[in-house]
Design a protein with these regions (language model features):
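Gram-negative/organellar outer-membrane beta-barrel architecture
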Residues: 162, 279-280, 299-532, 623-624, ...
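C-terminal outer-membrane beta-barrel translocator/porin domains of Gram-negative envelope proteins
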Residues: 261, 271-276, 355-359, 471-663, ...
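C-terminal soluble interaction/assembly domains
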Residues: 293-299, 372, 693-701, 707, ...
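C-terminal motif of bacterial Sec signal peptides marking the signal peptidase cleavage site
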Residues: 20-23
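Interaction-mediating elements
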Residues: 25-312, 318-321, 333, 426, ...
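Bacterial N-terminal signal peptides that target proteins for export
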Residues: 1-12
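Flexible glycine-/small-residue-rich
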Residues: 46, 142-146, 157-159, 227-233, ...
Length: 739
């Protein structure tokens, strides 16, 4: 049934779109004299010497408001049609945008103002309305002469601490002779100078105290700019302030005036008065995250560093810094008060999930998590998780327990680096972390096997910038042990050598490193990039040490062992690259994703450990195929294996790509059209799985392709996703039948 449906889907979709396009005539619903506004077009008439500027053109086009009614797939006004037919009381659609709601003269004035701000001082903007019987569009025309450019940049004023500091900041100026005159750049320069002066202690200075004088009389389309300080600014704005006093109030609450409530112990720590109301934190630990020091000039950077570090500790609900003038004997001094309000430090959480699989197995999973954010009074995060669940068959006349699982995991995260040597506080903006993890897991499939696993790791996490994060685990340990097997399972392993190797005891020991780049917090961008890349190594140092000590050569048939068990030796690299293109009005998004990975076993091992292999298929992969059911290559799983729920297809190489177009429908409902492609392969031949090895001449023909559509319920705090996908190419089918 899958193949006819796959071939019919494109035709059905095309027919649906054709019917919708033919039936969506919206002008018939307009009243007498009304015209549907269909949009605007902009023409730039450039005189010789005027540069091309796509950014400026985009900015002008964004002023052409309002937007006309949106279209579905660029073909028809779906939401306008839904509004016109009155479906669900017109709540699913959008009302028509009429020509009478457009103010083209106002739009033209805004365009003129923007061009003036960009240095096009001699320009004209006009518009015409092109009207049909029921529709109308507006044509805007801007005549541009070459823009004015910056001639010279000077700083006016006699020598003084403020004027001298102002001149010193000009080494980093944004204004350069020859650059186009731009009012936005002048505003950025004023903000930059204000920030630079605050770094030098000018606490009371403000950007509005700066004045740019522009003179275009020099000719040759140049503007000379002179920077000066306005007259009559407050005297405090011209003085450099230093810290006279520093008070830290730990356990502060808005329900009381902490300065007046007795009972808070006050101690002197590094020259600061530390007032402790709740005695939950070690004062010396808190002071390591405070960069404001008595006797030092005020610095905006140190202010921000203090706020960031204290909040990133994860133990404070609110952090506030208040500055008071404390002039003494004519000296410009500041008193700083740091208020720390802690969060609830100990929590416990229970989570119940229902699991349903495509092999007719279902059951509950219960997870309980205890979290202590301040284990040793230094913001040490301790997490203890317990989980358990079972699966039982439903339907098909089956009954009884099929499997159960249980696990315990403990993690300790410290807000600093733990190293055998001293590290300077180079990662001062973000809190560096050391984490230690230990976990035990039991999986019992009653008819087949009982498996035990142990995981442990020690490593570091630190952020280089807001968008860059590093995760390095010098020690990562995994032991997977098949404790018990049934005769039925042994017979299955004997018939499938690869399956047997996949379930052999796996001892993994080695380092891993992950780099993450994510600029999605930068909301002013139209395009966002996410990248995650990792490298995972196992057994290499052990293998080197044992080969030097034993002077014998190991092989997969005669491997080196540790604690009486052979260990895995491999190298694994994987990347996850995502790109998001967002429309100017934030309504639509084109999301693309590329995933690639390769793992290679050598030395002590002939195959990658099963837990380190790659899989494809499922709701977060190629959605038209069941989870972990694709590949490797063109290999088709025999029915005897497919009937067993524990057999997943895995490989050493993975390629996967996705493209998804997301668009609004109504209210919180959004739609999505997507295409997925991908597969996995083996590095080496496996006689039991023909067609599974990666070959450069055939791998493109073995990539599975699926497509579909979905809806998203965007509730801001979470998104509910429903997708319907269809396979377009099935690589396990014979050649000529895959599409």
């Amino acid at each position: 049934m899958r193949e006819p449906l796959t071939r019919a889907f494109p035709a059905v979709l095309a027919a649906f779109l054709a019917v919708m396009a033919a039936g969506c005539s919206n002008t018939a619903y307009l009243a007498q004299g009304e015209k549907l506004y269909t949009g605007a077009h902009l023409t730039l008439e450039k005189k010789p010497g005027t540069p091309d500027d796509d950014v400026l053109e985009d900015q002008l086009e964004q002023l052409m408001l309002p937007e006309p009614n949106g279209t579905f797939l660029g073909l028809f006004h779906l939401k306008l049609w839904l509004y016109n037919i009155g479906l669900f009381g017109k709540s699913l659609g959008e009302p028509p945008v009429l020509l009478s709601s457009v103010a083209p003269a106002r739009v033209a004035r805004r365009m003129y103002s923007l061009l003036q701000n960009k240095g096009y001082f001699q320009t004209e903007v006009s518009y015409t309305i092109q009207a049909e019987e029921k529709t109308a569009e507006i044509l805007y025309t801007a005549e541009l002469l070459p823009p004015y450019r910056i001639g010279s940049v000077t700083v006016k004023g006699e020598s003084s601490p403020l004027a001298d500091s102002l001149r010193a900041t000009m080494r980093e100026t944004l204004l350069h002779p020859g650059d186009p005159y731009d009012l936005d750049t002048l505003a950025q320069e004023r903000s930059r100078i204000d920030a630079a002066l605050k770094e030098r202690g000018f606490f009371h200075f403000a950007p509005e105290f700066l004045l740019f004088e522009a003179d275009s009389s020099a000719g040759d389309r140049n503007v000379d700019i002179a920077l000066t300080v306005k007259k009559g600014i407050p005297p405090q704005a011209t003085r450099i302030y230093t810290f006279g006093g520093l008070t830290v109030l730990s356990g502060y609450s808005l329900r009381r005036d902490s300065l007046a409530v007795p009972g808070g112990d006050t101690v002197d720590v590094d020259g600061a008065s530390y007032v402790d109301f709740d005695k939950k934190f070690e004062p010396a630990f808190i002071m390591r995250s405070i960069f404001l020091k008595r006797g030092q000039p005020y610095s905006r950077t140190n202010h921000d560093l203090t706020l960031n570090r204290l909040m990133n500790l994860g133990v404070f609900k609110f952090v506030n810094i208040r500055y008071d003038d404390a002039d003494s004997a004519g000296l410009p001094l500041l008193d700083a008060h740091i208020y720390l309000t802690p969060v609830l430090l100990k929590t416990i959480r229970f989570e119940l999930q229902g699991v349903s699989k495509s092999n007719n197995l279902a059951g509950p999973v219960l997870t309980s998590t205890f979290r202590n954010r301040n284990l040793l009074r230094g913001a040490e995060l301790f997490t203890l998780s317990l989980d358990g669940g079972f699966e039982t068959p439903f339907g098909g006349g089956q009954s009884g327990l099929n499997s159960y699982q249980a696990g315990i995991e403990a993690e300790l995260t410290l807000p600093h680096f733990v190293t055998p040597f001293t590290l300077e506080n180079v990662f001062s903006r973000f809190v560096p972390k050391t984490h230690m993890d230990l976990g035990f897991h039991l999986l019992n499939r009653l008819q087949y096997f009982q498996m035990l696993s142990v995981d442990a790791s020690f490593g570091y996490t630190w952020k280089e910038t807001t968008s860059k994060e590093h995760i390095f685990n010098p020690i990562a340990f995994t032991l997977v042990h098949l404790a018990k097997t049934t005769p039925q399972f042994e017979a299955l392993l004997n018939a499938n050598p690869f399956l047997r190797r996949s379930y052999e005891e796996q001892f993994i020991l080695g380092p891993n490193y992950t780099f993450v780049y994510n600029d999605q917090l930068e909301t002013d961008r139209k395009n966002h990039l996410y990248f995650k890349g990792g490298i995972d190594l196992s057994g290499n140092l052990l293998h080197l040490a044992q080969s030097l000590l034993t002077r014998r050569r190991a092989s997969p048939e005669d491997p080196y062992k540790i604690f009486g068990a052979p260990y895995s030796q491999y190298a694994r690299i994987d990347i996850d690259l995502r790109h998001y293109t967002i429309s100017g009005d934030q309504s639509t998004t084109l999301a693309t994703r590329l995933i690639a990975g390769v793992g290679f076993a050598f030395g002590n091992s002939s195959i990658m450990p099963y837990v380190k292999q790659f899989t494809v298929g499922g709701s977060n992969s190629v959605r038209a195929f069941d989870p972990r059911s694709l590949g490797p290559g063109s290999y088709r799983t025999p029915d005897s294996l497919a009937a067993n729920s524990f057999v997943d297809q895995a490989g050493d190489i993975k390629l996967e790509a996705n493209m998804e177009y997301r668009f609004p429908l109504v209210s919180i409902l959004r739609g999505a059209l997507f295409v997925d492609a991908g597969n996995i392969w083996l590095v080496r031949d496996d006689p039991a799985r023909p067609g599974a090895k990666f070959r450069g001449s055939t791998f493109l023909d073995q990539i599975a392709v699926g497509t579909g559509f979905g809806i998203r319920f965007d509730l801001s705090f979470f998104v509910l996703r429903l997708d319907l996908a269809f396979p377009l190419r099935v690589p396990s089918l014979p050649e000529g039948e895959r599409w």
